[in-house]
Structure formats: structure tokens, C-alpha cells
Amino acid sequence: MGTVILHSVVSVDGFIADDKGDVGPLHEWYFSGDVPILPGSGSGSGGAEGDEPFDHSGSGGGIRVSRASADYVRSTWDSIGAIVMGRNLFDQVNGWEGKPPAGEHVVVVSHRPKPDGWHPEASYHFVDDVTEAIDTARALAGDGTVAVNAGDVGGQIFAAGLVDEVAMDVVPVVFGSGRRYFGGVDGQHLLEDPHVVIQGERVLHLRFRVRR
């Protein structure tokens, strides 16, 4: 089965959003470069063939990263078979309207079911347990990567020992408070030295294997 990777864009002081859930300048690097990245253009594409991709930029400009980040972002997204997310993020982005940025499948950790009539064609699966979420995502992803969105749910999955790697796109900004990358994790966990270190423009891409 594929690798389970905890991932998010993060401030240098460890926050993925402010107290209200706003990402502020964290995602600016996604939309300020010269190289277009089409969500769902890899080995697993969200939505049916011929569908218009969901506009993750929110402005119609699409995702455009620097050349330094482009190869890393493409290879990362191309490897993803399934995404695991919490209900808060699902509600915030309305599940990307059934068209995730990468992979073909999404598992949502929630005590509430999928909304009635919501994009019945989309491969979105609602479960109420983090272990079940990873088991479901791995089965759906096959040999592909399982990408877990960081935050409260991601922190629970990490604390349960279900994460193989930690991936951070570190942006040079200090939030001071907000929603933490690792959620409520309060114990010590050792990681290996980073095996990926890529300096982009206004972002540093890092990946660490979890020490077992």
C-alpha cells in the first residue's frame, strides 16, 4: 500500500490558519508563479473526463507556482490516490465541489453523514473514526499516496501512529495564534532528518519520515 503523508502549508510558527480559519498569506505562493498546475491532471483526476476543474484559486486565475516549486508540486499531486480531510475543511470549501486537487477519492472524518444530494458522482466517503479513515483511504488509493490534511483530524491520525511522513510547505510568516498544523498533539514524536528540502519562492518544501 502507499505512503500516508500528513501535509499542509504552514507558517514558521506552526499554524495552518488563523483563529477564524483564514489562511491569509499562506497560499499566495500557489497563485503568484509562472508555471500553471492543473488540479487533477495527474494519475488520479478529480471528476469525470472533460469536466472543468474546480477553481482552487477562487479568482479564476488557477494555480500558478514558481518553477522551483512546480516539479515538486506536480510529482506530489500525481502520486496521490486518496485524500483524508476533516469535516470543518469539507464544509469550508464545500468539498471542492466534488473535484479534489489531486487523487480520485476523498475520505471525510465526520460524525455527520454526507449531505443529501451532494455530488452523488463524486467518490467521497464519510467515516467517524480516524483509523477507519486511513484504512478506507488506503484501500481506495491502492499503491497511491494517502494525503492527510493537517489540523485537528490530521493531528489525531498522526498521534495514532498512522502517518508515515510529514510534509510541510513552510511560508515565512508568523501568525502568533490560530489552528495548529498538528492540532492538539501534545506528546513528543521524533522525525528523521528531512529527505526533501526544496526552496521555492516564498515557500520552503520539507518532508520528514516519521521515526518508528
Predicted regions and their residues:
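Short acidic amphipathic segments
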Residues: L162-D164
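Portal/gating segments that form or line small-molecule/metal binding sites
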Residues: M1-A160, P172-R212
